[in-house]
A protein has these predicted regions:
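Core dinuclear metal-dependent hydrolase active-site scaffold
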Residues: 18, 95-119, 154-157
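Active-site neighborhood of phospho(di)ester-bond hydrolases with catalytic His/Asp-centered motifs
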Residues: 28, 48-56, 73-78, 108-110, ...
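Divalent metal-coordination and catalytic microenvironments
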Residues: 19, 29, 54, 66, ...
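Active-site-adjacent loop/tail segments of enzyme domains
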Residues: 134-161
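Short active-site segment of divalent metal-dependent hydrolases/proteases
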Residues: 57, 61, 114, 131-132, ...
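Conserved beta-strand hairpin/beta-sheet module of binuclear metal-dependent hydrolase folds
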Residues: 1-43, 116-127, 132-133
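Active-site HxH/HxHxD metal-binding segment of metal-dependent hydrolases
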Residues: 11-12, 25, 32-105, 190, ...
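Accessory terminal helices/loops
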Residues: 152-163, 170-246
């Protein structure tokens, strides 16, 4: 049986993910247990593991119910254990072997102290560390300098061919900010057009790649910690001057 991957939206803009390889399956950031169970059923999967990219409740809120209903093991970084209760700590771990599922773990503190990125079969699940066109804020237990260091030194060292799969779809809000910073950015303009075309068609946005984000995302185009911190502060206060055409 080939490996399978699913992304599912819940609430307005959250994403959860299902990873399946053979008889083994894991859920990532299943904040809505009903949606998570429906996706798993659609794929004929019984997830044995629940992985969390960070501890915020909109991503971890389904863990307790899913653990009870599925008998699943919950994994997350211990630095975020004040928000949820992982059965296994991801701190210091660079690899996970969960049955047939093999993932790389990249610790990326900043949005929260225990934020991690999960890499699986050419995909990078970024939680709220990196979004399409933007990055997470640090208002709820985060640290802008640590976030900047993670973007520069952790994300910055990863393969540009990786698909980016974030914890939220904020692309239509983020990319106009990128274009206000650099109105001549063809990469940001093309990506915004792609996202809007998907929305008009009633479809989910296609995933970007890390290389694409390095071209279109101002937080990955910045070259210093100070520059990223400054951009994050500016984004926190930003409101669009005028709608971007298209």
């Amino acid at each position: 049986m080939t490996a399978r991957f699913a992304r599912a939206r819940y609430r307005k803009d959250n994403y959860l993910y299902l990873l399946v390889d053979g008889d083994d399956a894991a859920l990532v950031d299943p904040g809505d247990p009903g949606v998570a169970l429906a996706v798993a059923a659609a794929y004929g999967a019984t997830p044995r593991w629940i992985l969390h990219t960070h501890g915020h409740a909109d991503h971890t809120g389904g863990s307790a119910e899913l653990r009870a209903r599925l008998g699943a093991t919950v994994l997350g970084h211990g630095a975020d254990a004040g928000w949820f209760a992982p059965d296994q700590d991801l701190a210091g771990r660079s690899r996970l072997d969960l049955g047939a599922l093999s993932l790389r773990v990249h610790e990326a503190p900043g949005h929260t102290p225990g934020s991690v990125l999960l890499e699986w079969r050419g995909r990078l699940l970024t939680g709220d560390t990196l979004f399409w066109g933007g990055c997470g804020n640090c208002r709820h237990g985060g640290d802008p300098r640590r976030l900047a260091e993670s973007l520069l030194h952790v994300v910055g060292g990863l393969d540009g061919a990786l698909e980016v799969h974030p914890g939220h779809d904020y692309a239509e809000a983020n990319l106009p900010f990128a274009l206000e910073l650099d109105p001549g950015s063809a990469a940001a303009r093309d990506r915004l057009a792609e996202v809007r075309a998907a929305a008009r068609a009633g479809a989910e946005p296609p995933a970007s790649t890390l290389a694409g984000e390095r071209d279109s995302n101002p937080f990955l185009r910045a070259r210093t910690v100070e520059a990223v911190v400054g951009l994050r502060a500016r984004r926190d206060e930003w409101t669009p001057r005028s709608p971007v055409p298209g």
